[in-house]
Swiss-Prot record:
Belongs to the Fmt family. One of its GO terms (cellular component) is cytosol. Its EC number is 2.1.2.9. This is Methionyl-tRNA formyltransferase. It is an enzyme of class 2 (transferase). The lineage of its organism: Bacteria, Pseudomonadati, Pseudomonadota, Betaproteobacteria, Burkholderiales. NCBIfam families: fmt. Attaches a formyl group to the free amino group of methionyl-tRNA(fMet). The formyl group appears to play a dual role in the initiator identity of N-formylmethionyl-tRNA by promoting its recognition by IF2 and preventing the misappropriation of this tRNA by the elongation apparatus. It comes from Acidovorax ebreus (strain TPSY). CDD domains: FMT_core_Met-tRNA-FMT_N, Met_tRNA_FMT_C. One of its GO terms (molecular function) is methionyl-tRNA formyltransferase activity. Keywords: Protein biosynthesis, Transferase.
Length: 323
């Protein structure tokens, strides 16, 4: 079976590697254009492009696939490459470009998407972050037959995984990437013998995982500790849950909900205790959060005890207050 692969980040690279290991022929890879990255802001190829080049696979990096859009020459060149590949199917994983109908129609078996949620819950750009942020007990991967809608196509395969209280977006991402790679191989093997049975998504339970905005990273200490703790986990590694002390920026990478209720006369964001277990901070609804791993601007992630050696804090100080 000839497979065109369209994807960009690490999540997609894992799936591409699994397809190649399973013996599928991949004549063409589509991925986002190289972007500036790192401290030197040098152009950097996506993980998928790096993988493709290592395996000698042709790579196309169009700015758009819309023939009537802003970059028609890019789209026309991509169309020629896609048609020349004579693929049976296209596999799409976190590609980052909208696929026009002509793309969906070109491969014999259409386009299959690896989506990191249990559809129809968390359609959209950030399903892993949003599942953790919402406190979901489980998530998973859905292999979907793509149509013109936003993650609305028929489901082909689905597998669940539990979200543990310790999971961050980083850990859950890695687990789902492996699951997605395994499921897409299974789906293509089933498709080769006509064994896939499309199931329409249910009309109930639709939610949208909107793209993460960096502005969301600011911790609102008026929220209950449980809500803040979920956001800390959801925003690791990006964009990181952030607060301030005066003019100094601080990121919180790990925390624990303290079972001891705080005194209600303490201001939300006020530091109530500092000990070997971390920094106790007053939160909304009379709750208490213990910060255990922190980072100051330009520094490294540090356990609370090490962080405090270079950034002294004291009970009574208020995090997130205007300087």
């Amino acid at each position: 079976m000839r497979v065109i692969f369209a994807g960009t980040p690490e999540f997609a690279r894992v799936a591409l590697e699994r397809l190649l290991t399973a013996g599928f022929t991949v004549p063409l890879v589509l991925t986002q254009p190289d972007r500036p990255a790192g401290r030197g802001m040098k152009l950097q190829a996506s993980p998928v492009k790096q993988c493709a080049l290592q395996h000698g696979i042709a790579v196309a990096q169009p700015l758009s696939l819309r023939l009537d859009g802003k970059y028609p020459e890019d789209a026309a060149a991509a169309k020629a490459a896609i048609e020349a590949a004579q693929a049976d199917v296209m596999v799409v994983a976190a590609y980052g470009l909208i696929l026009p109908q002509w793309v969906l129609n070109t491969p014999r078996l259409g386009c299959l998407n690896i989506h990191a949620s249990l559809l129809p819950r968390w359609r959209g750009a950030a399903p892993i972050h949003r599942a953790i942020e919402a406190g979901d007990a489980e998530t998973g991967v859905t292999i979907m037959q793509m149509d013109a809608g936003l993650d609305t196509g028929d489901m082909l395969l689905l597998e669940k995984t539990a979200i543990s209280p310790a999971d961050t977006t980083a850990t859950l991402h890695d687990r789902l990437a492996q699951l997605g790679g395994r499921l897409i191989v299974e789906a293509l093997e089933m498709a080769a013998c006509g064994g896939l049975k499309p199931t329409p998504q249910p009309a109930e339970g639709v939610t949208y995982a909107h793209k993460i905005d960096k502005a969301e990273s600011t911790i609102d200490w008026n929220q209950p500790a449980e809500v803040i703790a979920r956001r800390v986990r959801a925003f690791d590694p990006f964009p990181g849950a952030a607060t301030t002390l005066g003019a100094d920026a601080i990121k919180v990478w790990s925390c624990e909900i303290d079972s001891c209720s705080r005194t209600l006369d303490a201001a939300c964001g006020q530091i109530l205790s500092i000990d070997a277990d971390g920094i106790g901070v007053a939160c909304g609804a009379g709750s208490l959060l213990r910060l255990t791993v922190l980072q100051r601007a330009g520094g490294k992630r540090l356990p609370a005890a090490d962080f405090l050696r270079g950034f002294p804090l004291a009970p009574g100080m208020v995090l997130g207050a205007a300087p």
